[in-house]
C-alpha cells in the first residue's frame, strides 16, 4: 500500500526482526519495477509494460522520496558481496547511501522517459526537477572535487556516477583516471560486488577500456570467473571465492554477459525492438575469435569474428526484418 518494493516477489521469505530491515527492502533490488519495463521495451519494442505499470512505477519513486533525507537514501544492501579482505555480505568498500541514492537518481531518469511516453507533461516536469535535485544533493554529499573522487574512492563509488551521468561536466576524465588507478592498485582486479559489477564493466567498456576489462578477467585468481572455473564450479557462485560458502548456484555475478554481447561480439541495438542493429566487434588481448548469437523477435542473429594475420574477418547472419550496420572499431 505504501509503494515499497521488496527484494523478492512474491515474498516467500519475510525478513523480519533485528538487522533484517535492509533485506526486507533495498532500492538496488526495488528499482527493478522501473528498470525492467524499459529493458523489455528496448529488446522487444513493446512499451505496454510502461503504460500498464506507470502508476506503480511512479508510486515507488514517490515512496523513495518519503524515505530520503535531503534527497539522500541511506538504507539497503548497497554493493552486496563486494570483494576485499573481509567476510562478504553488506557493502564494505562503498557507502550504502552512495549506492542507494545513485539508484534513486537512475530510476527518476527512467521516469522522465516514462512520463514522456504516456504523455504526462506534469510528471515529466516533476521528475526532471527531482532528478536535478538528487544529482545536486548526491554531488554535495559524496563528491570530493579537489581529489576528483566519490565516497571512499572504491571502484563502485566511481563507476556508478560515471555510468549514470552524475559526475560534474568536465570532471569525467579525472574521475575515470582515478577508477583506472584503483583497478591497477588492486593488481588489475575488481573490488565490486553484485551491484557494482555492471557499472564497473560498462563504464570501462563505454570509455574504450576493453583491454583493461580483458586483463581484469583473463586470469584464474580470486576474484574472477576464471577461478570459479578452475575450482570446478558449473554455475556461477554467490561469492567470488566459492570456498567461502554461500550459494553455489547464483546468477548475480553474471553481468559480464553484457560485455560479451555488446563489446566482444559487438551486438548493439540501434532501435527499440532491435529491428536495427549495429555490429561493432572489439578485439582484445590474445583473443583469436568470438562467436555469439541472440534470439530476436525476427529470428536468430549470429555474429562471429576471427583474426586472420593482421586483419579481422567478420561474418554475420541476420533474420529478415532486422537491419544490420557493420562498423569498424
Q: Each predicted region: which residue ranges?
A:
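Active-site acid/base region of carbohydrate-active enzymes
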Residues: 1-11, 43-102, 115-163, 170, ...
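Structured core of small recognition/catalytic domains
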Residues: 1-27, 37
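Solvent-exposed loop and edge beta-strand segments that line ligand/cofactor-binding
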Residues: 16-30, 86-103, 140-158, 164, ...
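Well-ordered alpha-helical scaffold segments within catalytic/enzyme domains
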Residues: 33-49, 102-120, 159-170, 199-207, ...
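Hydrophobic alpha-helix feature that most strongly marks membrane-spanning transmembrane helices
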Residues: 45, 69, 116, 143, ...
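Flexible glycine/proline-rich, aromatic-decorated loop/lid segments
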Residues: 69-88, 170-184, 189, 221-238
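Non-catalytic C-terminal accessory modules of carbohydrate-active enzymes
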Residues: 129, 211-329
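Repeat-solenoid scaffold signature
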Residues: 185-224, 231
Amino acid at each position: 500500500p505504501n509503494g515499497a518494493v521488496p527484494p523478492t516477489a512474491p515474498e516467500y521469505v519475510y525478513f523480519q526482526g533485528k538487522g533484517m530491515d535492509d533485506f526486507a527492502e533495498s532500492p538496488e533490488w526495488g528499482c527493478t519495477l522501473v528498470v525492467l519495463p524499459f529493458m523489455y521495451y528496448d529488446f522487444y519494442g513493446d512499451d505496454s509494460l510502461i503504460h500498464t505499470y506507470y502508476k506503480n512505477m511512479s508510486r515507488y519513486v514517490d515512496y523513495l522520496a518519503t524515505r530520503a533525507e535531503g534527497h539522500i537514501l541511506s538504507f539497503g544492501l548497497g554493493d552486496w558481496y563486494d570483494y576485499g579482505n573481509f567476510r562478504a555480505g553488506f557493502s564494505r568498500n562503498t557507502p550504502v547511501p552512495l549506492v542507494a541514492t545513485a539508484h534513486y537518481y537512475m530510476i527518476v531518469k527512467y521516469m522522465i522517459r516514462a512520463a514522456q511516453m504516456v504523455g504526462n507533461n506534469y510528471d515529466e516536469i516533476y521528475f526532471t526537477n527531482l532528478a536535478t535535485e538528487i544529482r545536486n544533493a548526491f554531488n554535495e554529499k559524496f563528491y570530493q572535487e579537489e581529489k576528483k573522487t566519490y565516497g571512499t574512492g572504491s571502484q563502485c563509488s566511481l563507476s556508478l556516477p560515471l555510468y549514470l551521468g552524475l559526475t560534474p561536466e568536465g570532471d569525467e576524465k579525472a574521475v575515470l583516471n582515478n577508477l583506472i588507478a584503483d583497478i591497477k592498485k588492486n593488481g588489475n582486479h575488481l573490488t565490486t560486488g553484485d551491484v557494482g559489477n555492471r557499472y564497473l564493466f560498462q563504464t570501462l567498456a563505454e570509455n574504450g577500456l576493453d583491454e583493461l576489462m580483458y586483463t581484469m578477467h583473463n586470469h584464474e585468481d580470486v576474484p574472477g570467473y576464471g577461478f570459479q572455473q578452475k575450482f570446478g564450479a558449473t554455475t556461477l557462485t554467490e561469492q567470488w571465492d566459492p570456498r567461502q560458502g554461500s550459494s553455489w548456484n547464483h546468477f548475480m555475478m553474471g553481468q559480464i554477459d553484457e560485455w560479451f554481447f555488446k563489446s566482444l561480439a559487438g551486438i548493439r541495438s540501434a532501435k527499440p525492438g532491435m529491428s536495427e542493429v549495429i555490429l561493432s566487434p572489439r578485439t582484445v588481448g590474445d583473443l583469436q575469435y568470438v562467436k555469439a548469437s541472440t534470439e530476436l523477435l525476427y529470428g536468430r542473429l549470429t555474429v562471429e569474428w576471427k583474426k586472420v594475420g593482421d586483419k579481422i574477418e567478420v561474418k554475420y547472419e541476420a533474420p529478415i526484418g532486422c537491419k544490420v550496420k557493420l562498423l569498424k572499431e
